[in-house]
Each structure stands twice: as C-alpha cells, then as structure tokens.
Amino acid sequence: MIFRSFAAVNLELVEIQLKKRWASEYKWGRKQADIWDSQTNFIYTIADFDEVVARIYTEFNTHRKYEDLRNYALNRWYNFQSAMAVEHIFNLHSKVRRVKNDKDREKDFYIYGVAFDHKTSVFPSGFGKDVDYAVDNPRELAKWLYVNQSEQQRFHAKNRLFLVLHKKDGQHWKLKAELSWIKVLVDTYLDSYREL
C-alpha cells in the first residue's frame, strides 16, 4: 500500500531525514524485484530514517542476506520519500493541480489540465551518452527512459515528466535529498511553463 497524502509536508524535515541516508553506501545488490518489494513494503509507512533502520533490523537481522535487504529497503525508502516530497513541491505551484485519486498509477498531478506521471531519476549510465549530449537531445533521453524504466508495476506510455539528476562526481543519488534546491528548479521550470 502506498500512501501519498502529504498534506502538511515539512520539506526541511524530509530533507534532513533523507540526508541521513548518505552515511551508508548506496547500492542495491540486486535489481528491483516483487518478492523483496513485498517484504519491504513497510517503508511506505515510516517517514523517520532512524525508525526505518530499526524496523529493517527487526525484520531482517537474522536473514542471511541482511546487508542486501537492508540496502534494498533503505534505497526504496529514500527513493519513495524523495519522490513524494518532489511531488509535493510540484503540487505547491499555482499551475499544478493534484490528482484526486492518490492511488492513480498513471498520473501524479496536472499542469494546465494535462496529466503527468512524475519520475525523478538519476542520470542513467545505461543511456550510453554523456549528460551534455542528453541536454542537447532531451527527446532521445526521454525515449530511452520510457523504454528502459518502470518495467515492473508502473509501466505505461502516458505523459511523464522526468526530473533527471546528475552530479559531476557520480553521486547523482544524493541530489534526491536536496529538496530546497529541487524546489528552486521546479518553481523556475513551472514559472516559465506555458500552456500549449
């Protein structure tokens, strides 16, 4: 079950919680899979980093793959908390209207009445070209992202708004926690967004 009710989100607090994740290496250990997803779905109900760490320990400390499960659950928690906060950032803007059905898998919000599924992603190493090429050829990157992401539960070909993060040192994932910075970028983008 995924909860998307972020009525009173304190972005500063969420940013602090997300940055606690930086203390551990960010590695998945495996491709996202439904079995480990179901075992770690509790991450959707816990906003506090220390609480999620404690729950992971309680659930998996005797499991032979404890470290892998820990990394997997922490990464899912981190990505979920960041995605919900970024969605909240979009919804704060006057040009955006939130969806009425929080369980809608194909859209997160509307911009000028056009539905979008928001996806925050790190710059994909599998794209095969550098970030400068992607900036000059955004349609090619968007096409690659459509084809190569969300192969599991959320695949669809509806409108998506990709927020792609890149950091020169390769630590792209850390940018998902920089919510105050992301808010400036999103507001700048939406302020210049024009109805088609």
Question: Where do the PLM segments sit?
Answer:
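Nucleic-acid endonuclease domains
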Residues: 1-105, 120-196
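Conserved catalytic cores of phosphodiester-cleaving nucleases, focusing on short active-site segments
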Residues: 109, 114-120
